[in-house]
């Protein structure tokens, strides 16, 4: 068991910012198109964090042209270039699935000071 934990710790990223559900983040993802590789930003609200250790994932939601888009990222993925925390939000839940049903001003999240 120690051997598996040791290998996982080697592959974990150390330079990740602290964020939690309710925070607005910008995730810079490496995208491969043919032979070229570029970085694409995905900005939205973190609605869920799941798992632990190397298997930890988080889901980011944003609304684009009236359509809600959710994307789930492995936290320690080599495809993630960097994560920026734009705003910190106050929420009382760990999973913010209720935001899927809300739109406009009702979907706002208060700022943490």
Curated annotation (Swiss-Prot):
Respond yes or no to whether keyword Transcription is given for this record: no
Concerning SUPFAM superfamilies, the annotation shows: Translation proteins SH3-like domain (SSF50104)
One family name in Pfam for this protein: Ribosomal_L19
PROSITE patterns attached to this UniProt entry: RIBOSOMAL_L19
InterPro entries with a match to the protein in the record: Ribosomal_bL19, Ribosomal_bL19_CS, Ribosomal_bL19_sf, Translation_prot_SH3-like_sf
* Keyword annotations of the record: Ribonucleoprotein, Ribosomal protein
The record's GO CC annotations read:
cytosolic large ribosomal subunit
- GO molecular-function term, one example from the UniProt record: structural constituent of ribosome
Family assignment from sequence similarity = Belongs to the bacterial ribosomal protein bL19 family.
PANTHER family, A to Z: LARGE RIBOSOMAL SUBUNIT PROTEIN BL19M, RIBOSOMAL PROTEIN L19
Name the chain's protein. Large ribosomal subunit protein bL19
UniProt organism field: Desulfitobacterium hafniense (strain Y51)
């Amino acid at each position: 068991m120690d051997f598996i934990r040791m290998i996982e710790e080697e592959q974990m990223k150390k330079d990740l910012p602290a964020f939690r559900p309710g925070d607005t983040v910008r995730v810079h993802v490496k995208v491969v198109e043919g032979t070229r590789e570029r970085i694409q930003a995905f900005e939205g609200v973190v609605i869920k964090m799941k798992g632990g250790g190397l298997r930890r994932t988080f889901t980011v939601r944003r609304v684009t042209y009236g359509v809600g888009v959710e994307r789930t990222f492995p936290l320690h993925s080599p495809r993630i270039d960097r994560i920026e925390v734009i705003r910190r939000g106050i929420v009382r839940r760990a999973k913010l699935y209720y935001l899927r049903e809300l739109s406009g001003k009702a979907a706002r999240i208060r700022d943490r000071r």
